[in-house]
From Swiss-Prot:
Organism of provenance: Bacillus cereus (strain 03BB102)
Catalytic site: D319
GO cellular component term, pick one: plasma membrane
Record-linked Pfam families: E1-E2_ATPase, Hydrolase
Keyword NAD: no
Catalytic reaction list: K(+)(out) + ATP + H2O = K(+)(in) + ADP + phosphate + H(+)
Protein name per Swiss-Prot or TrEMBL: Potassium-transporting ATPase ATP-binding subunit
Principal location listed in the UniProt entry: membrane
Cellular compartment(s): Cell membrane
CDD domains xrefs: P-type_ATPase_K
NCBIfam families in UniProt: ATPase_P-type, kdpB
Residues noted as binding Mg(2+) in the record, renumbered to the chain: D530, D534
TM region positions: 50-70, 77-97, 240-260, 266-286, 600-620, 628-648, 672-692
């Protein structure tokens, strides 16, 4: 017997409301785009798109000719006005495509503005007094206390406390994230809300410079800068337009020599059909839509250039922890060395971790607790904490009695112990190798000049990583894993995950060296990062994807920011970049291929009366010369709105080699660009023939 499916009425209403709001927003965007289509007819706006500007000039000329009597004209009076209207709609359709793409960005900006409500901040003055001021009066360096239920007034970094923060206004993710002082996860964003506990933050941006302000200005696209590839393609298309313009302008000289004249409206129609109006009308929309697709992935691109660069990436540099593995390295077991005991290792491991707020440090405390190993917490709390640094690759505590306790990478701690005059137990490297071969991370525990044992930190490779790296390999992209682990651990993880290369015991300067080495080979490099120590490498990379949960320095150095703080998203970003480039290339191919059919429609129509042999080119058997010209023009106009969904969504992309992609696109959009207009123009000709 089947059980009835019960759905709460409230849930149904919520879903219905969301669907209704989405439909309303889409309708509003379309209405706004239609209005903007006419507003963009302003020549000052149109001249930014030379191809469509030529079409607009053609509309003006034919429109004026419609009201000027001409006894020498060989075409009826209605022909000029019909041509002018078709040209007007051609321009309007192109404007609509651009306005529609811009409208989606503005809709996202409007939703972001909702998070910029008037909020007040509890500012801590130098004398300790707390004063409530408006968020707009905050300046960089101000100290602010944010309590449970309060909105974070501006961008900042946590310097005291720990709290759960709801970032759904920025990321769309409802689950709160933990923000705490110290480390790489101290950054908070204005417009987010503290849902538990209390934190003290230092403001890192002045009014108008916050993260949300930057997001709004970027997604609105009001001052969108064209990318280098877009400029280059636009230059080529403009050059083609200029060449065809010269051809059409000089054509009457030759026709006069042959003893017949061509009407101005026919010449304008010929020019419009020859120039690449399809891609000219969709070029801006493709670029804006590419930025929009990245934004929908919750990635903020600082420029269209960054998105395009992602499509040309040859090498991706990935951190092991948190990207390839889950990053939750936990203490798995303790391994004593020499004649030491587990209790001794556990005692000193715990003392070195009492003040260590990292997940690894906390896991050591939890592990020691589960094993009921006793240690003196008080002496650790009274000591001076030595934080982990990428340069030293170890952390610990200096106790008040002068004892120095350290835990860290095998090589670093061994070197430190030797510098203290100590000796190294014979089984240290043996046990470290055992942990590494298991795919774990060994941390050596030492006190002054004596090594007590190792902590076995265990991490797990994320499922599906091998398949994703194989897809990148098919795309011709090399993957390089950078990790602070020793070579054995790095090799084990690299083999399991399926990366092409790895760099073990990697320091921040090593990442920069890897990036420069790849760039010296003429390759474009992408990398992810979240810490201040990643900032130089993020700035050096062609595509630097910083995590929103990371430090301000990392986000300022990168040219993309992932609002979900998911490092593996760099793979999706590369796919979106390739999709953008492929869409532009495919529609350019389609647009130029269209011209072949238009030649067979318009050329015979223009010259058949003077040169009867030209009738042989009328392979579509179009009804009449006037019908042929109008059919070609109508197809030229109608194809633009028909291709808007493809320009906005992007063409389907599957991981494959560049040669395979080129062959596939030439077959679909090259051959398709030849066949479709033959069919379309013929169908339109049949319909037009019924009226003339």
């Amino acid at each position: 017997m089947m059980r009835p499916i019960v759905v709460k009425e409230k849930q149904i209403h919520v879903v219905e409301d969301e669907v209704r709001q989405a439909k309303t927003m889409d309708r509003d965007i379309v209405k706004h785009a239609m209005k903007q289509s006419f507003a963009k007819l302003n020549p000052k706006v149109m001249i930014k798109n030379p191809i469509m500007f030529v079409v607009e000039i053609g509309f003006i000329i034919t429109f004026i000719l419609s009201f000027l009597p001409s006894h020498s004209s060989s075409v009826p009076g209605w022909f000029n006005i019909t041509v002018s209207l078709i040209l007007l709609f051609t321009v309007l359709f192109a404007n609509f495509a651009e306005a529609l793409a811009e409208g989606r960005g503005k809709a996202q900006a409007d939703s972001l503005k909702q998070s910029k409500k008037d909020v007040f901040a509890n500012v801590v003055k130098e004398n300790g007094d707390i004063v409530q001021v408006s968020a707009t009066d905050l300046r960089k360096g101000d100290l602010v206390i944010v309590k449970q239920g309060e909105m974070i007034p501006s961008d900042g970094e946590v310097i005291k406390g720990l709290a759960s923060v709801d970032e759904s206004a920025i990321t769309g993710e409802s689950a709160p994230v933990i923000k705490e002082a110290g480390g790489d996860f101290c950054s908070v964003t204005g417009g987010t809300m503290v849902v538990s506990d209390e934190i003290t933050i230092v403001i890192t941006s002045n009014p108008g410079e916050s993260f949300i302000d930057k997001m709004i200005s970027l997604v609105e696209g009001a001052a969108r800068q064209k990318t280098p590839n877009e400029i280059a393609l636009n230059t080529v298309l403009t050059s083609l337009t200029l060449i065809f313009l010269i051809v059409v302008v000089t054509l009457p000289i030759f026709t006069n020599y042959l003893g017949f004249q061509i009407d101005t409206a026919v010449l304008v129609a010929l020019l419009v059909c020859l120039i690449p109006t399809t891609i000219g009308g969709l070029l801006s929309a493709i670029g804006i839509a590419g930025m929009d697709r990245v934004t929908k992935f919750n990635v903020l691109a600082m420029s269209g250039k960054a998105v395009e660069a992602a499509g040309d990436i040859n090498t991706i540099i990935l951190d092991k922890t948190g990207t390839i593995t889950f990053g939750n390295r936990m203490a798995h077991t303790l391994l004593p060395v020499g004649n030491e005991t587990i209790e001794q290792v556990g005692k000193w491991a715990a003392i070195s971790s009492v003040l260590d707020e990292t997940p690894e440090g906390r896991s050591v405390i939890e592990y020691v607790k589960t094993k009921s190993i006793s240690y003196n917490r008080e002496i650790a709390e009274q000591g001076e904490f030595v934080p982990f640094k990428a340069e030293t690759r170890m952390s610990g505590v200096d106790l008040q009695d002068g004892t120095k306790v350290r835990k860290g990478a095998v090589g670093s701690v061994i070197e430190w112990v030797r510098s203290q005059g100590g000796t190294i137990p014979k089984d240290v490297n043996q046990k470290a190798d055992f942990i590494s071969k298991e795919g774990g991370t060994p941390l050596v525990v030492a006190v002054d000049n004596r090594i007590y044992g190792l902590i076995y930190l265990k991490d797990t490779v994320k499922p599906g990583m091998r398949e994703r790296f194989e897809q990148l390999r098919q795309m011709g992209i090399k993957t390089v894993m950078c990790t602070g682990d020793n070579p054995l651990t790095a090799a084990t993880i690299a083999k399991e995950a399926g990366v092409d290369e790895f760099v073990a015991e990697c320091k921040p300067e090593d990442k920069i060296a890897v990036i420069k080495a790849e760039q010296d080979k003429g390759k474009l490099v992408a990398m992810t990062g979240d810490g201040t120590n990643d900032a130089p490498a993020l700035a050096q990379a062609d595509v630097g994807l910083a995590m929103n949960s990371g430090t301000t320095a990392a986000k300022e150095a990168a040219n993309m920011i992932d609002l979900d703080s998911n490092p593996t998203k760099i793979i999706e970003v590369v796919g979106i970049g390739k999709q953008l480039l492929m869409t532009r290339g495919a529609l350019t191919t389609f647009s130029i291929a269209n011209d072949i059919a238009k030649y067979f429609a318009i050329i015979p129509a223009m010259f058949t009366l003077a040169i009867p042999q030209m009738e042989a080119l009328n392979i579509m058997k179009l009804t009449s010369p006037l019908s042929a010209i109008l059919s070609a023009l109508i197809f030229n106009a109608v194809i633009i709105p028909l291709l808007i969904p493809l320009a906005m969504k992007g063409i389907a992309y599957k991981p494959m080699s560049s040669n395979a992609l080129l062959g596939r696109n030439l077959l679909i959009y090259g051959l398709g660009g030849v066949i479709v207009p033959f069919i379309g123009i013929k169908v339109i000709d049949i319909i037009v023939g019924l009226f003339i």
